[in-house]
Structure formats: C-alpha cells, structure tokens
Amino acid sequence: MNIWLSMLTTTGLGAIIGGFTNHLAIKMLFRPHRPIYIGKFQVPFTPGLIPKRRDELAVQLGKMVVEHLLTPEGIGKKLTNEEFQKGLIHWAQVEVDKVITNEQSLRHMLEKWDVAHVEKEATEKIEQVITEKIQAFLEEYYTYTWEQALPHSVHEKIENAIPNVSAFILGRATQFFESEEGKARLSKMIDDFFASRGTLLNLVGMFLGNVSVVDRVQPEVIKFLGQDGTKQLLTEVLQKELEKLKGRDVKEVETFVEKEMIVSSILSAVKVEETVSKFLNQSVQQVCEPVRETIMEKVVPGVVTKGLKWGAENVASILNNLHLAEIVQQEVSTFSTERLEDLVLSITKNELKMITYLGALLGGMIGIVQGLLLLFLK
C-alpha cells in the first residue's frame, strides 16, 4: 500500500511540477511587462521575452510579411487569376451601374462629390478652347489667298453656281421694277437725273408728249433685264470678280470684320453657357443611357483588365513604394504589451494549453519512472 501511495505521490508531483513549469515558461514570454529592480539590481528574466524583444519582433514581422506573405509573385499571381478578374469585373459593373442609372441631376451628383463651380469652370474652359481653336484657324488661313484657303471642289461649286446667281439677281431685279415700289424708285431716279440736267427735261418732254418718262423707261428696263445677253454679261462680270477674289488674301477680311468680332460672334451663336447648364440639369441616367451598354460591356471590363495587368507588371515597384515592412514595424511598435499578449494568445491559445498539458504528462511519466526505481531499489 505504501509503495502504491509513493508512486501516486511521485506521479502527481511530477505532473504538477511539469505542468506548472511549462505554464510558467509560457507566462514568462509576456510577463512581467516591465523590468523589476531590487535596489539597483535588475531581477533576471524581467521583463518577459516578448516585451523585451518587441522592437526586434516588429522588425522581423515586417520582414516576414514582405518576404514570405505579401510577395510580388503571390500578389501578381492573384491579380492575373481568371476567377479573381471575373469577380472584380462583376463587382465593378454593379458599382458603375448604380452610378450611371442614378436619376439625380449631373449637377447634384457633382455637388455631392464636392466638385464646386463646375458650370462656371466648364463654360470658361470650353470658351477658352473654342477661342484658341478659332484664333489658330484664322492665324493659319490669314496666310493664304482665297484660292489656297478653299478646296478645289468649293471653287468648282461656286463657278458652277454663278449662272444661277446671275439668273436669280436678274429675276429679283425684274420683280422689283415690275412692282409699284420699283416703279416709284425708278421714277425718283429719273427725276433726280433730269433735275441735274436743267432744260434737258423740257426737251425730252416735247418728244414724249403726255406720256411720263417712267412709263417709257420701265418696260425697257424690264426688257433689258430679261435678255440673255444681260444674263451673259452679269455672269462674265461675276466670274471676273471671282477670279480677282481668288488672288486676294484672306487676311483682308480683317478690314471689314475684326478677329475678336468673329470669335465673339461664334461664341454667341454656340451659346456655351446655356448648353453647359442644360447638360448639367440632365439626370445622370439621361446622360449615360446612350452609352450605358458600351460602358458596361466594354469600358468597365477593359479598364479593370488593363488596370490589373498594369498592377501585376508593376507590383514589385508598388510594394517597394508602399514600404510595407516599415508600416508593419511601426504598427507593431505602437502595440501595448497587453495588446501584443492578447494578439499572440488569441492565435496560439489552444497550442499553449496543449504545451502545458504536455508538461504535466511528461512530469507524471517521470514521476512513475521515479516510483518504479524506488520500488526496485527497495
């Protein structure tokens, strides 16, 4: 009976000592958090291992993350993974679709995104671009003659149109002189002519008798305007003037219309401010609807694919510029010892318990061996 009690005692003591020793060793990894002094003498094993080596641990964790966890190869492989790309494209399409189907006005959306004075800035920018383009166009074309400035096809169209222009001018002139207004104007011209000639009017009156001069002149004017020869004459005059115009410089337009007036007239016709205002008052859905399918089926997948490809090709440079090791080191260095202890224990809690139990098991086995040795020695 005493023998079995001795074996039980040695086994129990061995288990207790083994378990407690391992438990104490685990605790000494973290405790105490600060060095303990007796006078000027620092108690050995204080502070605990992890508090004492926290800075070194932070450095090593940073290196481990960069060299073994977040490696360029690993991230690059993930970025080029087909399933990952499909998932990211789908997510991007969903998010983009939420934006482009929004019924709020474009102006309201921009204000939500803190884009201020967009209407004023857009108007000024567009007007500036238009002005610069017009001025550049005029600067270039002012160095040309009209023959150089206009395409050959335009010259042909103008030349072919001259007979029709002549017919149009003569037709309108005929209509005018056939009207009462035209007759009155012709009468005034005749009166002014004879008024400057004095007695010539009396001499003409003797020949014409009671018939007024305008009644005799009007039919002749109309007859003259309707003759083919008159049309041919006017056509030849217009053709000669066109040939003269071809050799003249475009810059001569400035003598009639200043460059600034041309620019101002075009800007007034375009109505940039009104156009921009109408555009911003449209809903995002109205603006994007014509191109929604293109955005969803082509633009979004294309942008995501190219972005991932660029990221995979430049991942090493990106990681270097991020300085991940320094970030991890700085974050770990800011952890309190208590937080660091909780972090490690939350990960290794079960394993550390098993180490304690293993110590108790080994201690118990040693106790059994001691009991057996005592038994044989007796």
UniProtKB/Swiss-Prot annotation:
Q: Does the keyword Membrane apply?
A: yes
Is Aminoacyl-tRNA synthetase there in the keyword field?
no
* Family the entry assigns: Belongs to the UPF0754 family.
User: Any idea where this protein resides?
Assistant: Cell membrane
Signal peptide positions are none
Residue spans crossing the bilayer: 1-21, 357-377
- Supply the alphabetized keyword list: Cell membrane, Membrane, Transmembrane, Transmembrane helix
Q: What is this protein called?
A: UPF0754 membrane protein BCAH187_A1042
Gene Ontology CC entries for this record:
plasma membrane
